[in-house]
């Protein structure tokens, strides 16, 4: 029995090693990722990101960070690891959170399935898309609920980028528009945090910095994914993004950061909003739909955020997990540092 167990274990280890070598050969490091790894701060922040215990949306945004960096090896590993936590709806990465939170992993999962041709990943990706299109609870106009019958600013970064990445462009735009019409506060010129559809009113009108960052990041990627024959939709989303960025930048602190409630200087100073907005600006300037004048604000954000990375690679001062009610650390904070750095590196490389 011992000998049999040893043989089985040896064979399994051999197969795993072969599979690992195959993946490594199939996904060589991109020039962008090689450039990022030359920065000690990036390497530390990456290690810290992977050290966190993560819930579904956290796994999702960490996956996006490595997808944005061209680090396919890590994206594929995260996707395969997420298969062990299915939800009752058949979604993966189902560790805590709201109904739509696993959708934040959609882009990475779809990409991993395409790259590896792994049947298990393909099935998981197709199941997630079917859920998003047909089964996720939603309002009468099709806008997907975050939890219960509420719509949150966080969800700008769940279903819309995934739908666009999977080629469902009209549905992605529909989700952005449905969230925008409920959550955009034209008086504050900021995104409110939560809308209660059943009560037809805000359940939280607070312009949370993280929520505005989620919105900017999600809209940015949808714009990037939309093809040329969706120019009218692109123009509409670009206008939303500019309004959002202008509204936030009006409240940027002299140190480059923002308060946790964007328009309330009495709320604590928070790091992640700056990273999220800087990422959005760098990507948008690189994409050509945002003027270079925004780089002044983005560079201040980036400099401030880089100054918040501690010796272990943790980005300090973000709205802390799991309560988000005080400064601390979080997987989101790590992810958006990495995304900001990747977007900045792409912009620098392409403007040399």
What are these regions (language model features)?
Residues 4, 65-68, 107, 111, ...:
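Residue-level signal for well-ordered alpha-helical scaffold segments within enzymatic catalytic domains
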Residues 8-17:
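Bacterial N-terminal signal peptides
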Residues 26-106, 112-127, 131, 135, ...:
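CBM-like carbohydrate-recognition segments
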Residues 1-9:
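Bacterial N-terminal signal peptides that target proteins for export
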Residues 150-154, 160-262, 267-278, 292-318, ...:
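Extended ligand-binding clefts on enzyme/binding-domain cores
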Residues 4, 73-74, 207, 213:
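Compositionally biased, low-complexity linear motifs
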Residues 20-24:
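Sec/Tat signal peptide C-region and signal peptidase I cleavage site
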Residues 76, 85-198, 203-205, 311:
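Extended ligand-binding groove/face enriched in aromatic
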């Amino acid at each position: 029995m011992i000998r049999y167990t040893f043989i089985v274990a040896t064979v399994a280890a051999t197969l795993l090693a072969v599979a690992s070598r195959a993946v490594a050969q199939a996904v060589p490091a991109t020039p962008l990722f090689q450039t990022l790894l030359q920065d000690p701060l990036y390497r530390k922040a990456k290690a810290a990101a992977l050290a966190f215990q993560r819930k579904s949306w956290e796994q999702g945004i960490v996956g996006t960070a490595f997808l944005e960096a061209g680090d396919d090896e890590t994206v594929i590993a995260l996707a395969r690891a997420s298969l062990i936590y299915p939800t009752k709806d058949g979604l993966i990465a189902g560790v805590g959170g709201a109904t739509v939170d696993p959708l934040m992993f959609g882009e990475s999962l779809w990409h991993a399935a395409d790259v590896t041709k792994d049947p298990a990943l393909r099935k998981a990706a197709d199941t997630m898309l079917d859920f998003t299109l047909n089964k996720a609870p939603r309002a009468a106009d099709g806008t997907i609920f975050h939890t219960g019958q509420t719509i949150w600013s966080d969800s700008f970064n769940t279903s819309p980028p995934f739908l666009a990445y999977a080629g469902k462009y009209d549905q992605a735009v529909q989700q952005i528009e449905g969230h925008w019409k409920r959550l955009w506060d034209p008086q504050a010129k900021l995104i409110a945090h939560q809308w209660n559809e059943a009560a037809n009113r805000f359940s939280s009108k607070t312009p949370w910095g993280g929520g505005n960052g989620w919105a900017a990041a999600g809209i940015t990627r949808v714009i990037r994914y939309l093809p040329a024959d969706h120019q009218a939709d692109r123009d509409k989303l670009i206008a939303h993004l500019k309004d959002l960025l202008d509204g936030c930048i009006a409240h940027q602190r002299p140190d480059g950061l923002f308060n946790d409630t964007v328009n309330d200087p009495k709320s604590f100073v928070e790091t992640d909003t700056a990273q999220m907005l800087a990422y959005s600006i760098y990507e948008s300037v690189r994409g050509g739909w945002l003027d270079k004048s925004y780089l002044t604000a983005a560079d201040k954000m980036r400099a401030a955020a880089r100054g918040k990375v501690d010796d272990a690679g943790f980005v300090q001062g973000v709205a802390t997990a799991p309560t988000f009610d005080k400064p601390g650390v979080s997987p989101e904070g790590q992810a958006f540092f990495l995304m900001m750095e990747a977007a900045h590196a792409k912009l620098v490389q392409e403007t040399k």
